[in-house]
From Swiss-Prot:
It comes from Daboia russelii. Keywords: Blood coagulation cascade activating toxin, Disulfide bond, Hemostasis impairing toxin, Protease inhibitor, Pyrrolidone carboxylic acid, Secreted, Serine protease inhibitor, Signal, Toxin. The modification Pyrrolidone carboxylic acid is found at Q25. Belongs to the venom Kunitz-type family. This is Kunitz-type serine protease inhibitor DrKIn-I. Its main location: secreted. GO terms for cellular component: extracellular region.
């Protein structure tokens, strides 16, 4: 296969992975954890997956501690926990 064909295949696989939803069974267990601000006193805007709404939502993180349901972007939250894309991405 030519290098152009390989690049096309890689692009299609990447697109497919972005569009394929993660089922609740495949979702990492930490996606079901409540957001934790942690023990420090920072005020960092972060994203967590909310299993009740099936959305990636904003919370404020203190900067240390907390749990793994803590993402810098909605895109990373969606990729990890499988929430559908809604509204403007971060």
């Amino acid at each position: 296969m030519s290098s152009g064909g390989l690049l096309l295949l890689l692009g299609l696989l990447t697109l497919w992975a972005e569009l394929t939803p993660i089922s609740g069974q495949d979702r990492p267990k930490f996606c079901n954890l409540a957001p934790e601000s942690g023990r420090c006193r920072g005020h960092l805007r972060r994203i967590y997956y909310n299993p009740d709404s099936n959305k990636c939502e904003v919370f404020f993180y203190g900067g240390c501690g907390g749990n793994d349901n803590n993402f810098e972007t909605r895109k990373k939250c969606r990729q990890t926990c499988g929430a559908p894309r809604k509204g403007r991405p971060t």
